[in-house]
Amino acid sequence: MRFKGLDLNLLVALDALMTERKLTAAARSINLSQPAMSAAISRLRDYFRDDLFIMQRRELVPTPRAEALAPAVREALLHIQLSVIAWDPINPAESDRRFRIILSDFMALVFFDKIILRLAREAPGVSFELLPLDDDPEELLRRGDVDFLILPDLFMSGAHPKARLFEERLVCVGCPTNEQLQGQLSLEQYMSMGHVAAKFGRGLKPSVEQWLLMQHGLKRRIELVVPGFNLIPPLLSGTNRIATIPLRLVKHYERTIPLRIIEHPLPLVSFTEAVQWPALHNTDPGNIWMREIMIQEALRIGI
């Protein structure tokens, strides 16, 4: 199909090349042969009068022109997919849809497990791909590469719709044998003790408790950094280290790991866990159904 002289199939090829950055992988992703993909690149270059991609160290590096085209091309393809091709009222009992969701290990453990159990009964064909926190989740939402982002809402952009899930509170926690945790913890004690902290993504972005502490201008003595909240409780056992983690996570682990909960010496505000989805998916029936399930389950655990 052509539109003003452009074969619209070439836009699919351009999007694949921008995503994969390798000729063979891009061709495979849209079921083209390598020669056919090479021909598509040639035709794209002729139409846009630009090289679009330059080979460097066996990788296709996009030119500024290709970088400028990419967002509009991806948005157009997503709009066609969601509004024309894929739009269909969902039948949960028969659906085989897969949802890609970015969330922390903490939320997977204390919240999303309930979604999985519920849908095993109500929509057994639905599956999930749970992804770790990314350095640029907003870009993944914009590209439609993920269906949902579950995070504290203070980390979410205003570019996409979102909904509140529940309030969470931070507490200080340590091993019961830690003699410094026998009474109320002063700010001086808190700052002088060794801490275990979680950071996320390749760029090791701070977690919510570190972000909140930074708002008070405080920097802890972090002795151990781990790639997620769920590793923290086991690593406190037998040590004098402490951590600041969500209360629901402590409640989950205290059944199997001895932990002592101490009120935080700072009036740290509770934070809101929220779910966000791509703006282009806002009217997608499957997306609407899935986020309603999440909001219903969040209401149950938020009581």
From Swiss-Prot:
Gene3D superfamilies: Periplasmic binding protein-like II (3.40.190.10), Winged helix-like DNA-binding domain superfamily/Winged helix DNA-binding domain (1.10.10.10)
Pfam families on file: HTH_1, LysR_substrate
Ranges of the DNA-binding region feature: 23-42
UniProt keyword annotations, A-Z: Activator, DNA-binding, Nodulation, Plasmid, Repressor, Transcription, Transcription regulation
Entry annotated with the keyword ATP-binding: no
Alphabetized GO MF terms: DNA binding; DNA-binding transcription factor activity
Record family assignment: Belongs to the LysR transcriptional regulatory family.
Protein's UniProt name: Nodulation protein D
Gene name per UniProt: nodD
